[in-house]
Amino acid sequence: MEDDFLFMTLLYDFYGALLTDKQREIFEMYYLNDYSLGEISEILDISRQGVYDALKRAEDSLEFYEEKLGLVKKHQEMMKKIEKIKECIKLIKEREKDEEILKIIEDMARELEELNP
């Protein structure tokens, strides 16, 4: 359940701007501000079922965008590769004695840190 929650918020980070204003508002209230469906219903003066339907449409839209574009998957794969490269750099730094090579490695590590803080 928590993984679904995190995945939905990650999808929202990438594709949230593609949702309608109402879907975005309801999604943010539910996922980001931790309102219940009933609370959202009262605040927006719509039925609980209406809130549920709008939230479900938003979730379906986000999943559809990911299915078609795959940006989240690509991002996650890139982050894994960056971590692997950082581990390799660390091992090389521990074994390398040449100062020039160490400087190059330090520069590479710094650039990777900028990509993945």
Swiss-Prot record:
Pfam families: UPF0122 (PF04297). This is UPF0122 protein TTE1463. It comes from the Bacteria. InterPro entries: RNA_pol_sigma_r3/r4-like (IPR013324), UPF0122 (IPR007394), UPF0122_fam_protein (IPR054831), WH-like_DNA-bd_sf (IPR036388). PANTHER family: UPF0122 PROTEIN CBO2450/CLC_2298 (PTHR40083), UPF0122 PROTEIN YLXM (PTHR40083:SF1). Signal peptide: none annotated. Belongs to the UPF0122 family. It comes from Caldanaerobacter subterraneus subsp. tengcongensis (strain DSM 15242 / JCM 11007 / NBRC 100824 / MB4). Might take part in the signal recognition particle (SRP) pathway. This is inferred from the conservation of its genetic proximity to ftsY/ffh. May be a regulatory protein.
